[in-house]
């Protein structure tokens, strides 16, 4: 729709949906008799994206197919093809098992909890979070390093179930179909290979405490959290159908895997072992349950995690893609922040390569990318709101290296430029 203001010779165009004029928006798109602004287009895209989450291709039992789960994982997580395939199949089978639980009683299908093994910043946590988003089930994350046996200072393992209950708005039925991700699981390994007479309350003790809730038990949870009191009423949560995903970096596990089967010998006649020059992620692909036992996990705990998915180190190319391609890519996030100041942010390709190399040098993986970008853009984000005529900021390789400041491209902002109209 278009309106004419007073006796103006030039008509002012308005968005047919929100009513904003062409002076208030960046772009108007013209149809046969209507106009739509860029802000409304963006809002429509958000609505479509939300609806597409609930329109996943379902198999006959109402569970998303492994290929569909994998496709959505690809939107958020770059690389890690093997881990995505393992997770897609395991999660599909888990929820298919729940869908058929009451139909066939002749065969009891066991739960398949998942162990994610991969270097720091390789995407373990993001994979678990994305799975919960795809399946629209309650999700909670726990840090294994804060857990202790019941009766000791620290978090009880039952607090994990309480967090899941809170994530489901205290809907017990939904919580019982949720996903729990326990991070830093390698930090609760037994302190030595041999059982000790001293109590290991944050290592083996936590593994023992986790066994029952991972296997399936009815946990008594205080409805509003806090410590248990005798007069307090408890919510009963059955953990049998909760999917547990445990993840850890397992620093040092690659040495255990490499040494397996080689044997040891000493003396002048000893054979010289060539060092394993494979990357950590490649070595992890050969992991066996016996390696996890040597690392310090108890046999019963390893047995509760039958599905092993390993993640690889992220190389420079993968880190560059992570910066640019996912829906929540860091470059897109910062570009949106700059757009709010009506400034276009541009990264040169070589600059992104240098950012990726810095993350590899720091051994922080994808997790370290944000802090690197934050450091690069700090001064610019500090100065920009006070500058009048900046239209574009360009980040080159010299900026990443700290040798120069970003390039500011100025324009004439004295004139209020109306939104451009596309037919």
From Swiss-Prot:
Q: Which SUPFAM superfamilies would you find in this protein's record?
A: Glucocorticoid receptor-like (DNA-binding domain) (SSF57716), P-loop containing nucleoside triphosphate hydrolases (SSF52540)
Q: Which residues bind Zn(2+)?
A: 15, 18, 37, 40
Instruction: Report which superkingdom the organism of origin falls in.
Output: Bacteria
The ClpX-type ZB domain covers which part of the protein? 3-56
A Pfam family (short name) is ClpB_D2-small
A cellular component term (GO) from this record? HslUV protease complex
Q: Could you tell me the Gene Ontology terms of the biological process aspect for this record?
A: cell division; proteolysis involved in protein catabolic process
The molecular function terms of the Gene Ontology recorded here are: ATP binding; ATP hydrolysis activity; ATP-dependent protein folding chaperone; protein dimerization activity; unfolded protein binding; zinc ion binding
PROSITE patterns (UniProt xref)? CLPX_ZB (PS51902)
Arranged from A to Z, the UniProt key words for this protein are: ATP-binding, Chaperone, Metal-binding, Nucleotide-binding, Zinc
Q: Which residues bind ATP?
A: 119-126
| Assembly and interaction partners | Component of the ClpX-ClpP complex. Forms a hexameric ring that, in the presence of ATP, binds to fourteen ClpP subunits assembled into a disk-like structure with a central cavity, resembling the structure of eukaryotic proteasomes.
The record's comment on protein family reads:
Belongs to the ClpX chaperone family.
Matching HAMAP family: ClpX (MF_00175)
Role, per record: ATP-dependent specificity component of the Clp protease. It directs the protease to specific substrates. Can perform chaperone functions in the absence of ClpP.
Record-given protein name: ATP-dependent Clp protease ATP-binding subunit ClpX
What organism does this protein naturally occur in? Methylorubrum extorquens (strain PA1) (Methylobacterium extorquens)
- Name the gene behind this protein: clpX
């Amino acid at each position: 729709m278009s309106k004419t203001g007073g006796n103006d010779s030039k008509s002012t165009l308005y968005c047919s949906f929100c009513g904003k004029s062409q002076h208030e928006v960046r772009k108007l798109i013209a149809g046969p008799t209507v106009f739509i602004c860029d802000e409304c287009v963006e809002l429509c895209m958000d609505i479509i994206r939300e609806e597409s989450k609930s329109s996943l291709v379902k198999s006959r039992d109402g569970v998303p197919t492994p290929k569909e789960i994998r496709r959505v994982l690809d939107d958020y997580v770059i690389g890690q093809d093997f881990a995505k395939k393992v997770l897609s199949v395991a999660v599909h089978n888990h929820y298919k098992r729940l869908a058929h639980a009451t139909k066939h009683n002749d065969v009891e299908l066991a739960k398949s909890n998942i162990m994610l093994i991969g270097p720091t910043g390789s995407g373990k946590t993001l994979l678990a979070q994305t799975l919960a988003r795809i399946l629209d089930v309650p999700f909670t994350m726990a840090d294994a390093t804060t857990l202790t046996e019941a009766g000791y200072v620290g978090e009880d393992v039952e607090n994990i179930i309480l967090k899941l209950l809170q994530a489901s708005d205290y809907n017990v039925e939904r919580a019982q179909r949720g996903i729990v991700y326990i991070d830093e699981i390698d930090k609760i390994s037994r302190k030595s290979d041999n059982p000790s007479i001293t109590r290991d309350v944050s290592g083996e003790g936590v593994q023992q405490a986790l066994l029952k809730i991972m296997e399936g038990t009815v946990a008594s949870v205080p409805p509003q959290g806090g410590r248990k009191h005798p007069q307090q009423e408890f919510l009963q949560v059955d953990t049998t159908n909760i999917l547990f995903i445990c993840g850890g970096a397992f620093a040092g596990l690659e040495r255990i895997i490499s040494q397996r089967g080689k044997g040891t010998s000493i003396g002048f006649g000893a054979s010289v072992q060539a060092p394993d020059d494979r990357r950590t992620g490649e070595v992890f692909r050969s992991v066996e349950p016996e390696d996890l036992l040597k690392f310090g996990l108890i046999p019963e705990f390893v047995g509760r995690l039958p599905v092993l998915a390993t993640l690889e180190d992220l190389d420079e190319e993968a880190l560059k893609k992570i910066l640019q391609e996912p829906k929540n890519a860091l470059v897109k996030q910062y570009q949106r922040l700059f757009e709010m100041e009506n400034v276009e942010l541009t990264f040169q390709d070589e600059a992104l390569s240098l950012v990726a190399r810095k993350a590899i040098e720091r051994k922080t993986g994808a997790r370290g990318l944000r802090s690197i970008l934050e450091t690069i853009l700090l001064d610019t984000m500090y100065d920009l709101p006070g500058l009048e005529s900046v239209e574009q900021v360009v980040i080159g390789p010299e900026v990443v290296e700290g040798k120069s400041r970003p390039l500011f491209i100025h324009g004439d902002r004295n004139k209020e430029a109306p939104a451009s109209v596309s037919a």
